[in-house]
Amino acid sequence: MEVSEFEALRQHLMSVAYRLTGTVADAEDIVQEAWLRWDSPDTVIADPRAWLTTVVSRLGLDKLRSAAHRRETYTGTWLPEPVVTGLDATDPLAAVVAAEDARFAAMVVLERLRPDQRVAFVLHDGFAVPFAEVAEVLGTSEAAARQLASRARKAVTAQPALISGDPDPAHNEVVGRLMAAMAAGDLDTVVSLLHPDVTFTGDSNGKAPTAVRAVRGSDKVVRFILGLVQRYGPGLFGANQLALVNGELGAYTAGLPGVDGYRAMAPRITAITVRDGKVCALWDIANPDKFTGSPLKERRAQPTGRGRHHRN
């Protein structure tokens, strides 16, 4: 099989694998395994795209099923692994999350589906894979595959509109103002940009400090932010670097050293969801294992110590 044929499909395969697993590391492993199977001398392929999509989907289903126990024993909230790219979107990973169904909030919703529902929904609704092929991936009937996708669709639409709704065209403007206000310590502007029902959700698996439970409501989120400033210092938000997080404006930071009596802050990625011109969700990913798809990926191998969670 020609390498060029496979490389022409790599972006598509990464897009499928990432949506199925929610992690860049797993997606890369899956695409590599698909290449090894493609490169086998015994492999005869009539339709490379369909064949490779099926292989990637089956591997993704296996990953989801094997990950179920790990996620049950995970410390705190499990969030998808974000894809962080430059503002010019020239990073090859930017194309993997270019579509709206890969926005961070959309990936969070996918985490709430059963593995078979997720596969059926992603393949059919996301990539227009016929139900006959979806059924082949799942080892079930076409009718059962349709039912799985239907149930997944209902589960997705049943999620709060603030999370499952369409991306807000004012996203970049709102996030830019929020980050500037945070860096300047302008709490009045910060409050004005938060939706009354805003949530702050942390994910570190106990490896770095973050919220132990989701913080809900603008008043509580503002108090939480004030607590962060008291802990890490007034330069906390000035350390953020704007970037695209799953195709939408967000931020990341390599962390801060502990100086002048303030504590050191671990590296983290901030994904932000905007609806109706207001910030309705802040996602704080501080687990270094989830930095694979970001400029912080070198930090994965560096020990961070067991993090003490912020109380909320």
UniProtKB/Swiss-Prot annotation:
Region of interest called Sigma-70 factor domain-2, as start-end residue ranges on this chain: 6-65
Designated name of the protein: ECF RNA polymerase sigma factor SigJ
Gene3D superfamilies attached to this UniProt entry: 1.10.1740.10, 3.10.450.50, Winged helix-like DNA-binding domain superfamily/Winged helix DNA-binding domain
Location of the motif Polymerase core binding: 29-32
Family per record: Belongs to the sigma-70 factor family. ECF subfamily.
Free-text disruption phenotype from the record: No difference in growth in culture up to 120 days. Increased sensitivity to 10 and 20 mM H(2)O(2), no difference in response to growth at 53 degrees Celsius, pH 4.0, 10% ethanol or 0.05% sodium dodecyl sulfate (surface stress). No detectable difference in spleen or lungs of infected BALB/c mice during 15 weeks growth.
Cited function: Sigma factors are initiation factors that promote the attachment of RNA polymerase to specific initiation sites and are then released. Extracytoplasmic function (ECF) sigma factors are held in an inactive form by an anti-sigma factor until released, although no anti-sigma factor is known for this protein. Regulates the promoter of SigI, may not be autoregulated.
Domain commentary: The sigma-70 factor domain-2 mediates sequence-specific interaction with the -10 element in promoter DNA, and plays an important role in melting the double-stranded DNA and the formation of the transcription bubble. The sigma-70 factor domain-2 mediates interaction with the RNA polymerase subunits RpoB and RpoC. The sigma-70 factor domain-4 contains a helix-turn-helix (H-T-H) motif that mediates interaction with the -35 element in promoter DNA. The domain also mediates interaction with the RNA polymerase subunit RpoA. Interactions between sigma-70 factor domain-4 and anti-sigma factors prevents interaction of sigma factors with the RNA polymerase catalytic core.
Segments crossing the lipid bilayer: none
Region annotation (Sigma-70 factor domain-4) ranges: 107-155
Coiled coil: none
